[in-house]
Every structure is written in C-alpha cells, then in structure tokens.
Design a protein with these regions (language model features):
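Intrinsically disordered, low-complexity regulatory segments in ankyrin-centric signaling systems
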Residues: 5, 24-56, 160
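Ankyrin repeat A-helix N-terminal signature
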Residues: 40-45, 74-80, 107-113, 140-146
Length: 160
C-alpha cells in the first residue's frame, strides 16, 4: 500500500467532497505531515516528478519527513539510483541524518542496494558514519547478510 500524502489541491478537494456529502457534520482537517510529493517521487523512483518538483521548489531537495528522512534516504532505501543522481546533482546532503542518525548509505547498505552503495561512496558518503547507537553501514550490511555490500564497504575502509 502506498503512503498517503496530502497536496494542498488534494486536501481542498477532499474537504469539498466532505462538505457536500456531509452537510452539517463537524469536519476535522486531515493531519498535516511533513511527507510531501518529493518524498513520494523519491520513494517511487519518479525522476520526472523529482525534476519537476525541484525546478519549482529547489529548497525541497533536503526536506525531511516526520522521521527525519530526506528524499535521498527514500531513494536509497528503494534502490532508485537515477532518482538519487538527480537529488545529488541538485544538492542533496549525502550524509544527512534521519531520526536515529541513519544516513542514506546506512539504508542502502541495509537494503543491499549495491549500485546505490557504489554511487554514494563515489560521491563522497562517509563510509564509517555512525548512527545514534554507534552502528556503521558495514554493521548494517553484515547484520542483514548483504555480502556484496559488505565487500564493497570493506574495500572502502569500512569498519564495524
């Protein structure tokens, strides 16, 4: 199931539908979230959507959701290398930390995204960045038995 997000237009439309179908009801507006269209585009690997969104809202490149994840975290989690390239070209912070201190390299290593790990390392991601529990990307790759990622991280000086 896809994660819901509310754009201002969609929110206005849903409110209008509720008003029409529920005359006299007490309306509670939808809970606003920090999850925006750019996060959905990154999650889906929608390069066209990312490009269009960033052309209109360049500051959104490092916009965080409720969990502190940037669009780059989400692209890395889902192995969307082309989306990550767009985000990095537009100034995404390669070592941004989400809640818990995880970086895009952490989530790519945990997911076993070999091409993403290679891209992030080539672009300068810190191979030994530690999360709030002291874990490194190599710790995550080892825990999740991502053997190819383990080899790549070790070749780049990764430590546990």
């Amino acid at each position: 199931m896809k994660t819901q997000f509310f754009s201002p237009i969609r929110t206005a439309f849903l409110t209008a539908v509720l008003v029409i179908t529920c005359s006299g009801c007490f309306l509670i507006p939808p809970k606003h979230s920090d999850y925006r269209a750019i996060h959905e585009y990154a999650t889906d690997g929608n390069v066209a959507g990312l490009t269009q969104d960033l052309a209109a809202y360049p500051g959104d490149v490092n916009l965080t959701d409720d969990a502190g994840r940037t669009p780059l975290h989400l692209a890395a989690t889902h192995c969307h290398v082309d989306a990550a390239k767009v985000l990095l070209d537009k100034g995404a912070k390669i070592d941004a930390k989400a809640v818990g201190g995880t970086t895009p390299l952490d989530v790519a290593a945990q997911a076993g995204c070999v091409d993403m790990v290679n891209l992030l390392l080539a672009k300068g991601a810190k191979v030994n960045a530690r999360d709030d529990q002291g874990r490194t990307p190599l710790d995550r790759a080892t825990q999740w038995k991502r053997d190819e990622v383990v080899q790549i991280l070790r070749a780049h000086g990764g430590i546990e």
